[in-house]
Amino acid sequence: MILLTGATGTAGSFIANEFVRERVPVRILVRNRAKAAGLEKVSTVEIVEGDMSKRSSLGPALDGVDRALMISAPDMDMVETQSTFIDAAKAEGVRHVIKFSGLDARPDTTFPFGLMHLEIEKYLEASGLVWTQLRPTGFMQEYLREAPSITKDGALYLALGNTKLNPIDVSDVAKVGFLLLRDGGHEEARIPMTGPEALTMVEIADRISRAIGRTVQYVPISPEQRRQALIAHGIPAPIADALDKQVKERLKGGIESQVDLSTRQIFNIQPTTFLEFAQRNAAAFGAAA
């Protein structure tokens, strides 16, 4: 049996859809069954309710599981939540845990979530379980959050200066996550994934423009303006502060400005370009019907 957690989130839902499309049996762990209503009638999907942060709730989800892919919400309790899941997986006899981590899981980062991912990776590797760390870069889907200003003002307001980033389509990552869960292997491996291009925000705005058929301009703002905008949109201050540190780190360049297609070659996956992503999501970005 294989188990997928986080199946109602951004990445987890894409991975769940891969299982549905390929008709491969999978068990998914959700806190709220209602959020997985679209999967209720899929004969190859077993839905189990439980909370990754509450070990006592995880027995039914982990019973008979050989491999599990671990994803949880990016919040300030992520280390505690995922460590609890790792402990429960070990106690229930799970053999192999695949952690959905991040490219910024490294000791020299100042980004709190990168440091959290690294701490969890170390905990998993010390647990005695077989492990795999899947490390994608930031998602192209993050730019969909900018759709309101793109639609209203024809502007992409971000605090990223002239830096280049290597965003990846979540659907590409989901294909690798699916294959790791279905087939196993790649044990004690750290698997990086990036998009096929390192792009400035001007270049990203250009690709959105081409996809929707009207001009979108990149308008640089300050990191503090970005932080205040996040808070104004309901992002909790600790999360906004963490993202502020990520922005300041991205402005320095580094690993998120580099392209690495080695994982795609191993798994034989054709990378999605940002233009292809923008064309597929043109309506969301405000293209005329």
PLM regions with names:
Residues 14, 224-289:
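A hydrophobic C-terminal alpha-helical subdomain
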Residues 41-53:
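Rossmann-fold cofactor-recognition segment
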